[in-house]
């Protein structure tokens, strides 16, 4: 019997599911809005909200805990510096799920998961490390 067993398996092993949540939460923190299936969005929501709550609490131990769940230093910095400050007065409910129709190829229900009060300029931009182009010496 599986009474009170929470969470969806999403047709994946536990390690694959964990990798999926890590990658999608990093993408959500980076772009502040992603499109995925409704089932994945519903499972991603508590994972991401717990990360934001850890960031709001601050501290070295919480930063290390968040790093073990996120594994992306640039998104970890954004999580603790930008998002924790943005949601300091909000008690939960940091994400929103909006249904986005049905995918044509396999009829899967799609959804947009986004951060509430998001920065609209973050969508589609690369907030990763800045690529510095090397300037060639013209003294040849």
From Swiss-Prot:
Recorded source organism is Zymomonas mobilis subsp. mobilis (strain ATCC 31821 / ZM4 / CP4)
GO cellular component terms, alphabetically, are: cytosolic large ribosomal subunit
- UniProt xrefs under SUPFAM superfamilies: Prokaryotic ribosomal protein L17
Description of how the protein assembles with itself and partners: Part of the 50S ribosomal subunit. Contacts protein L32.
Is Ribosomal protein one of the keywords UniProt gives this record? yes
Is Ribosomal protein a UniProt keyword of this protein?
yes
Single GO BP term: translation
What is the protein's name according to its record? Large ribosomal subunit protein bL17
């Amino acid at each position: 019997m599986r009474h009170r067993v929470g969470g969806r398996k999403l047709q994946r092993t536990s390690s694959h599911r964990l990798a999926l949540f890590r990658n999608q939460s990093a993408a959500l923190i980076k772009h502040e809005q992603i499109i995925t299936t409704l089932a994945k969005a519903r499972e991603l929501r508590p994972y991401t909200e717990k990360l934001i709550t850890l960031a709001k609490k601050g501290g070295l131990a919480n930063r290390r805990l968040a790093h073990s769940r996120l594994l992306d230093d640039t998104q970890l910095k954004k999580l603790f510096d930008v998002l924790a400050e943005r949601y300091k007065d909000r008690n939960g409910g940091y994400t929103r799920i909006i249904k986005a129709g049905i995918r044509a190829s396999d009829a899967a229900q799609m959804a947009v998961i986004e951060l509430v009060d998001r920065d609209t300029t973050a969508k589609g931009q690369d907030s990763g490390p800045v690529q510095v182009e090397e300037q060639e010496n013209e003294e040849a």
